[in-house]
């Protein structure tokens, strides 16, 4: 029997934003150039202004592309949590553990009527909900997206996706500017693009009554990381978008700003640099946007297409509902069909936790619950 959460009418989520806690990084991890997990910050990149006029299609034929069709579950995030808990000797206090991408989908739901989603969730040790993307749904959605793209005019979807990674390559250095050879800086346009390396931030944040542990990739840092854990970090999110030529383009861009804002808001990223490009992928502008100013900017236009406070209030209310309905073990499916006015929740496995939780994580949590060993 499925429980249903009504998205409509979204007017009930209007009003002042429910309380939110500033995201604080308490751990991080990296994937190297081969996408191997590393429990460190070795893949951190540093922002450096890109050269305008660059062709974002250049290097597409040598693109070292990550195959992300496999199901990695929450494994890397859980490994990082285990290492943190081993260091502190206590369990993190979050009651939701998930990837930033899952929370982005949830927060965008009131104003994103076209995209559906499927997630798997499980309860472990009474309180926390661990939520992952349903991989089969992700793969099928991408296949449909590719089929739809073949029917539209313009560059292939794969090329347009590459433009975003090319912009990241043009806008980042592997070390601070003072430590980077001039030859490397001037040769960025010829660098082989590789999206396998990633730096992932793990933060504690809060929306309404829920305390969240989120993991997500950050593209670059503006200056350097502060020594003290939990201090604000000058992260930079990098995006590409078609240049704005008319009112319709501006409306489309304001719609895109919703996900830009949510993604950055959830990890505490204060700055977004948008690379505006021509229709055939030539970089014409790099615009610096402060994350906290996006909601007021969008609201300054007539008939704004989304509202930040409503996104927060929707997420807070939905997470409360989820907590009240996921009350025992097993694997639960969180499902929204495209254009559906409801989100469904139902069990797909009566017992256990599926593959959402790794054996390493479960064994560690059992050991932690038993307390200090009496072995001498």
Swiss-Prot record:
Residues binding a divalent metal cation, per UniProt: 168, 219, 237-238
Cofactor(s) needed: a divalent metal cation
Keywords associated with the record: Hydrolase, Metal-binding, mRNA processing, Nuclease, Nucleotide-binding, Nucleus, RNA-binding
Cofactor note: Divalent metal cation.
Subunit text: Interacts with RAT1; the interaction is direct, stabilizes RAT1 protein structure and stimulates its exoribonuclease activity. The interaction also stimulates RAI1 pyrophosphohydrolase activity, probably by recruiting it to mRNA substrates.
Family recorded in the similarity comment: Belongs to the DXO/Dom3Z family.
Function: Decapping enzyme for NAD-capped RNAs: specifically hydrolyzes the nicotinamide adenine dinucleotide (NAD) cap from a subset of RNAs by removing the entire NAD moiety from the 5'-end of an NAD-capped RNA. The NAD-cap is present at the 5'-end of some RNAs and snoRNAs. In contrast to the canonical 5'-end N7 methylguanosine (m7G) cap, the NAD cap promotes mRNA decay. Also acts as a non-canonical decapping enzyme that removes the entire cap structure of m7G capped or incompletely capped RNAs.
Protein name per its UniProtKB record: Decapping nuclease RAI1
Organism listed in the record: Gibberella zeae (strain ATCC MYA-4620 / CBS 123657 / FGSC 9075 / NRRL 31084 / PH-1) (Wheat head blight fungus)
């Amino acid at each position: 029997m499925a429980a249903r959460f009504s998205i409509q009418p979204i007017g009930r989520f209007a009003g002042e934003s429910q309380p939110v806690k500033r995201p604080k990084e308490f751990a991080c991890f990296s994937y190297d150039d081969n996408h191997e997990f590393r429990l460190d910050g070795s893949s951190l990149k540093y922002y450096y202004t890109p050269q305008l006029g660059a062709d974002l299609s250049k290097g597409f034929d040598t693109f070292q592309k990550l195959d992300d069709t496999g199901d990695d579950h929450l494994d890397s995030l859980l490994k990082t949590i285990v290492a943190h808990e081993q260091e502190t000797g206590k369990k993190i206090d979050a009651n939701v553990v998930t990837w930033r991408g899952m929370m982005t989908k949830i927060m965008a739901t009131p104003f994103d009527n076209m995209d559906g989603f499927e997630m798997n969730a499980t309860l472990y040790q009474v309180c926390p909900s661990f939520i992952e993307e349903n991989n089969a749904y992700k793969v099928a959605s991408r296949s449909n997206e590719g089929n739809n793209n073949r029917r539209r005019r313009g560059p292939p979807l794969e090329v347009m996706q590459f433009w975003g990674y090319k912009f990241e390559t043009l806008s980042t250095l592997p070390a601070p500017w003072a430590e980077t050879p001039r030859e490397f800086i001037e040769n960025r346009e010829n660098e082989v693009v590789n999206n396998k390396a990633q730096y992932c931030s793990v933060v504690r944040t809060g929306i309404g009554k829920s305390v969240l542990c989120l993991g997500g990739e950050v593209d670059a840092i503006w200056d350097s990381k502060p020594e003290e854990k939990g201090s604000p970090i000058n992260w930079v999110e990098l995006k590409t978008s078609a240049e704005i030529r008319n009112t319709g383009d501006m409306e489309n861009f304001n719609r895109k700003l919703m996900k830009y804002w949510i993604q950055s808001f959830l990890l505490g990223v204060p700055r977004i640099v948008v690379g505006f490009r021509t229709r055939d992928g030539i970089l014409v502008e790099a615009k610096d946007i402060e994350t906290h100013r996006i909601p007021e900017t969008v609201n300054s236009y007539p008939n704004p297409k989304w509202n930040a406070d409503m996104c927060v209030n929707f997420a807070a209310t939905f997470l409360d509902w989820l907590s009240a309905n996921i009350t025992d073990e097993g694997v639960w499916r969180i499902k929204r069909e495209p254009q559906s006015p409801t989100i469904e929740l139902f069990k797909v496995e009566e017992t256990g936790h599926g593959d959402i939780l790794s054996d390493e994580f479960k064994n560690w949590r059992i050991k932690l619950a038993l307390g200090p060993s009496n072995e001498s």
